[in-house]
């Protein structure tokens, strides 16, 4: 919408707080902060420790934002919301004497810069660094109190050296299930050598040759290579993690089709930490919504592992309903299951139902045709297909509950990446199984009474029927009894299963961290020694991976780094002489650099370690005295979007726990407290074709919206939602800073509502924050002369009480991130001072200090004009006097038969009989009673008087 910017008129008083003056003040104080290192914060040890050797303050506060990706579009007004909120929080605690660490880096690896490089031939680093310069300029205008010395980008070689180092720590570790923690791989080897850990298969470590030993060790690593079914996106030329695929089976970035494909890929064994990732959610101060999302993503469920025997070996399934085993009338494997090719019969058994054959002459032909037919389907499409399809393998399995032979099928609704990739099908208890059985004419056996399985599956509680020794039991009892029978028969065991899959940790792109891994002539992977780090990303002649038709499911990835042959092929001495090796040509996913960056903020110049233990312990170590005995440690406040709940936040927790297990950090969680900020949204406008038009040019007229386009005025439709360049409703913070000043933008965004709530942007409302700051300015500065107005007058009682209520209220609000209510209290107090023409220093100085977290530039300038030298950034924040927080008098509404007829004010400590007497003497109450004697008078202390007549 078209708005008129605030600009000084010719008759504007010379010293009025205008956008021009605000800009001058802001630039001056930002320079002063930079020159003085105002926001530089000391570490206990290292290059950022106090030069005089003094100790750092015991009270600290580590505040962190989810750092931005430096896109080419720059910032719009929605982006700074969280950054301003954390700055207010950090400034408040800094003013209370805390040693506050607040810094901001950039998550700079990723697809957008690479795509731009492909299109233009410009190196991604060139584009990324230019974007970072612009981001720093835009964020710098906001007056954010960051320690600029601690800023970095994940693309900095000195940074990703330590990303590679962490990868090697995880690669060279294994998870000891007995101790429930990661341990160095050398300790596993030592146990094998000593014979305290069994190799398996009846062999000893001494029986194994070098290759077999390496294979055994590699199978235990927390990072491993696996031939697994992955999400292949031909349109992006790379594989994707499950978390990067949308619910409808497309890539989050680019919206390309994603296909399931078997490839050899790096995986991280995050599943080993499933229980700890779940359990430690209970000790985190995080939003319930995020905790629920992580719990659902990890998806812990209890049940039984069951083995169905076949001629080709056991088929293992996991079921949460072992009680229904007598109702398992067939089995289904994922088409990609390892056993499929071994189970396929050479010919159809006699009497095979034609519906089971897929129209093929042999089971092998049917399997091949079926696999080809589903190759282009996403996981979601496979699971949501209303028409059930499948192929009989010509093989049977033995149901361990009753010994019956059940046919084995493959079907697309069973996925290789979930559970064991095989199910026991109980059509009476699962609707998908029921649909499949109905489609293929398979038996449906009722095993839990309570429904009509001829109509649909029944999954509720009831009494067991048609279930042999389980008959008559309830479901819970039957689950336990069947599990015990399976254990006794050697055909199963109780088990916990998770939805969480291991983390696919490789991308066939260019702009990412290279793997610190090489392969020998036999194709075996070797982690590089730490002394060979960093492995720097080389320049390539062409940044693009071999791209494919987005629908070409049969395509194969070809990473750009494979083109740099003189980088790929190297001669190295890894401890056994100089030998030829080849480098891994994949790069790490975009989540790698953001999985540990909180640690680097604590020690950004350390060249010997990712951070000194003393610095990590100071900034992130557990503080049970402050946070309770179960405090996991971590960053004190982390603010960012809820969209990262099961991506960045889960991955960073996993990495941090591995580092904790290996003794590199003292905190077992990276983020003690998390707050998800809401979104700033705005109106957008579309013409009759659905095309967006510039929102700033739209005019509202007679309840309609028109756009004065090149062909004349056009009526447009209004919609509400995200802010973005593509929606043509983006408002730059530069524009608001130019027209009102950065402090006005800060106050406006913090005043819009609770931080966690989404809120609508309205440029026309910014003027309210602007006028508030003008009123604060006028209380201290004469607009005509520029003189400071502060006097040494004493404060009246009403002002004193309001002052101290405001101090107490804003302090509590700032500490609780309720910046909107803090602003409201400051506006109320400012209005009182303005209305009462209060110019007393005793009223103005606390106001300036309280305003400082919200509007720091204005506050600094006023503090200086009030005669103070130096910055107020380190306070002190005013303290409330408890004496003025207690009211001397109390106002009681007086009700007569339930309706308020008058009000009386009495001393706060007045006894009930005195309150009653005052109420009965109130003029309006006396008139209403008109001589009648009350039957009863009820005094509710501090609240009301009720007279019953």
UniProtKB/Swiss-Prot annotation:
Residues 540-562 are annotated as: Disordered. Keywords: Aminoacyl-tRNA synthetase, ATP-binding, Cytoplasm, Ligase, Nucleotide-binding, Protein biosynthesis. A motif ('HIGH' region) lies at residues 68-79. A motif ('KMSKS' region) lies at residues 722-726. GO terms for cellular component: cytosol. It catalyses: tRNA(Leu) + L-leucine + ATP = L-leucyl-tRNA(Leu) + AMP + diphosphate. Its EC number is 6.1.1.4. GO terms for biological process: leucyl-tRNA aminoacylation. It is found in: Cytoplasm. HAMAP family: Leu_tRNA_synth_B (MF_00049_B). Belongs to the class-I aminoacyl-tRNA synthetase family. This is Leucine--tRNA ligase.
